[in-house]
Amino acid sequence: MFARALCRLAVAALVLTAAACDSGPTGLRSGYLSLALTDAPGDVDKAVVTIERIYLQPDSTNDNGRVVLLDSAVTVDLLTLQDSLMGLVDSVRIPEGTYGQLRLVISGGYLSIIGADTTTRQIYASSPTYAGLPAGAVVTGTLQMPSFAQSGLKVNLPSDALTIGDDESVSLVIDFDVAQSFGKAAGNSGKWVMSPVLTATKPTP
């Protein structure tokens, strides 16, 4: 039942917009970046993640270093974002230059699976003590989230780069494909694995 429901899910999306300006307070050329999160209706009960940090990773031609866009935890149920946007980052100034990746540091999460009787729930969490669990929740099994809390979830940008130039506006849509991002581990371990499938594209005018 759960696998069938997953296949019917639409994607979630991170929406990025960037607008360059002449200079920042220090005289460096810079732009602005905003992030929002959205999802379309689906049948899965809950798919909750905590995004601890979001940052842009410069490419080899950019000496500006890593740019942190979000540095405070945001916990979101992807399935509540039906036909709407959730603001994550609002107009953060970023230095002019070229960036090769967007990274999301995901510190934890859980899945709630509807039982065959449609009333019971099975919960698979990254940790039994995950702070995003609802009060009184009984964890059925493990949701594996390999290395996302350390190196961050890597999202390659269109043409392998995002360039912010003088007086330029750039928009990107990053699709979080929920249907392909969660799966049950092989064998009888009872574990679920989070392997996010994210793609970054420029929206069609």
Language-model region placement:
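Bacterial N-terminal signal peptides that target proteins for export
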Residues: 1-10
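C-terminal motif of bacterial Sec signal peptides marking the signal peptidase cleavage site
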Residues: 16-20
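A short, solvent-exposed, low-complexity linear motif enriched for acidic/polar residues
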Residues: 22-205
